């Protein structure tokens, strides 16, 4: 659990898009190996195919590539595919690991021509390393400062031509100079249920899980549009099927297993439902501040804001307003309650089916 989350949240929710213990090795076995095997993101795949094919035809390295989007959508898998399509070696690191310029210089000095350098969470790279990266991306060289004070000297070092692939969940947190140095930027969107079902059927084949078509659709519909969540739910359903049934995952088995893990039809878990229930039942639908809402569910504000809210907002159940969080009609309905007729969003009355006056109404004076 991240220290900033605190509270009672253990970070092990089956519908968390972040990596949790046990995901790493299994995710590696499920990753697609080339663009043809990658399911979903058709626009990104087409654009990347053009970028990579063009570079190979010219015999050079492609432009630096930035992959942005929420966690769990396949940015790391796409970076590995880029290296495989180019026939190059992949060097992996992360923004938080590059605390000093020397850390980056050591990594860059070990690159050979054509290598792909993947920096995950690139928005968290330290400022000194980021400034060194500017020169490396543009001119394939770095200036290493030796010594301190007036006697310090700068030694230029050549860097083999490489392709940087950066991944970020917060593209807005990137500085302008860094963002401008990427020649191609791809935003990865959430997946459709049909795409997630395809991913699940492929993963089931790799893991040796007997997964029925209807069961695949059932799991996909609760996966929040995220392949990482879909694959994690598949493993939990597999456990249930092997322990309490004959190992075959049917729709009924999937439904029963997901009920055990507190994942409902929309992919909401216990904490999500607690937040909705508190917002509607304790505060009449809001508006209410996130700190007050967090106290009501016994969690830290950061947990509510970073773990629960993104999906609840995307699902249209919570609206963020200047006055606080407001429950939408969908939230009331999800809890089996009737929305109030005078629904209010952020202090503004929602007017439904009101005819708009004509500018050319002959009865107007």
Swiss-Prot record:
Q: Name one GO molecular function term.
A: ATP hydrolysis activity
At which positions is Mg(2+) bound?
76
Question: What are the alphabetically sorted keywords of the record?
Answer: ATP-binding, Cytoplasm, DNA damage, DNA recombination, DNA repair, DNA-binding, Hydrolase, Nucleotide-binding
In the UniProt record, the signal sequence range is: none
Q: What class of enzyme is it?
A: hydrolase
Q: Which CDD domains match?
A: AAA (cd00009)
Question: Binding positions for DNA?
Answer: 320, 325
* Entry GO terms, CC: cytoplasm; Holliday junction resolvase complex
Region of interest called Large ATPase domain (RuvB-L), as start-end residue ranges on this chain:
1-191
Subunit relationships: Homohexamer. Forms an RuvA(8)-RuvB(12)-Holliday junction (HJ) complex. HJ DNA is sandwiched between 2 RuvA tetramers; dsDNA enters through RuvA and exits via RuvB. An RuvB hexamer assembles on each DNA strand where it exits the tetramer. Each RuvB hexamer is contacted by two RuvA subunits (via domain III) on 2 adjacent RuvB subunits; this complex drives branch migration. In the full resolvosome a probable DNA-RuvA(4)-RuvB(12)-RuvC(2) complex forms which resolves the HJ.
Q: Which NCBIfam families match?
A: PRK00080.1, ruvB
- Domain statement: Has 3 domains, the large (RuvB-L) and small ATPase (RuvB-S) domains and the C-terminal head (RuvB-H) domain. The head domain binds DNA, while the ATPase domains jointly bind ATP, ADP or are empty depending on the state of the subunit in the translocation cycle. During a single DNA translocation step the structure of each domain remains the same, but their relative positions change.
What is the similarity comment for this entry? Belongs to the RuvB family.
- The name this protein carries in UniProt is Holliday junction branch migration complex subunit RuvB
Organism, by scientific name, is Rhodococcus opacus (strain B4)
């Amino acid at each position: 659990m991240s220290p900033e989350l605190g509270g009672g949240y253990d970070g092990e929710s089956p519908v968390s898009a972040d990596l949790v213990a046990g995901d790493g090795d299994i995710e590696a076995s499920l990753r697609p190996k080339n663009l043809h095997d990658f399911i979903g993101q058709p626009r990104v795949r087409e654009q990347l195919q053009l970028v990579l094919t063009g570079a190979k035809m010219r015999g050079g390295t492609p432009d630096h590539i930035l992959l942005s989007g929420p966690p769990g959508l396949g940015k790391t898998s796409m970076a590995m595919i880029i290296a495989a399509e180019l026939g190059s070696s992949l060097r992996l690191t992360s923004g938080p690991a590059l605390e000093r310029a020397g850390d980056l210089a050591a990594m860059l000095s070990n690159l050979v021509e054509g290598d792909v350098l993947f920096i995950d969470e690139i928005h968290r790279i330290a400022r000194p390393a980021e400034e060194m990266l500017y020169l490396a991306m543009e001119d394939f060289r770095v200036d290493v400062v030796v010594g301190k004070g007036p006697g310090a000297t700068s030694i230029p070092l050549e860097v083999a031509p490489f392709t940087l692939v950066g991944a970020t969940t917060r593209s807005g947190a990137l500085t302008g100079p860094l963002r401008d140095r990427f020649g191609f930027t791809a935003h990865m969107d959430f997946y459709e249920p049909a795409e997630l079902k395809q991913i699940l059927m492929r993963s089931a084949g790799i893991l040796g899980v007997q997964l029925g078509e209807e069961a695949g659709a059932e799991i996909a519909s609760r996966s929040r549009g995220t392949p990482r969540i879909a694959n994690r739910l598949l493993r939990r359903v597999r456990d249930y099927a092997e322990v309490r049934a004959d190992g075959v995952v049917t729709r009924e088995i999937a439904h029963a297993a997901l009920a055990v893990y507190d994942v409902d039809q929309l992919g909401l878990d216990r904490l999500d439902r607690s937040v909705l229930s508190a917002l509607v039942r304790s505060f009449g639908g809001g508006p209410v501040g996130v700190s007050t809402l967090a106290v009501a569910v016994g969690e830290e504000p950061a947990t509510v804001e970073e773990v629960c809210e993104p999906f609840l907002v995307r699902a249209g159940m919570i609206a963020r307003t200047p006055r606080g969080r407001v429950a939408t009609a969908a939230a009331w309905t999800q809890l089996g309650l009737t929305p109030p007729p005078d629904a209010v969003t952020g202090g503004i009355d929602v007017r439904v089916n009101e005819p708009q006056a004509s500018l050319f109404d002959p009865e107007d004076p």
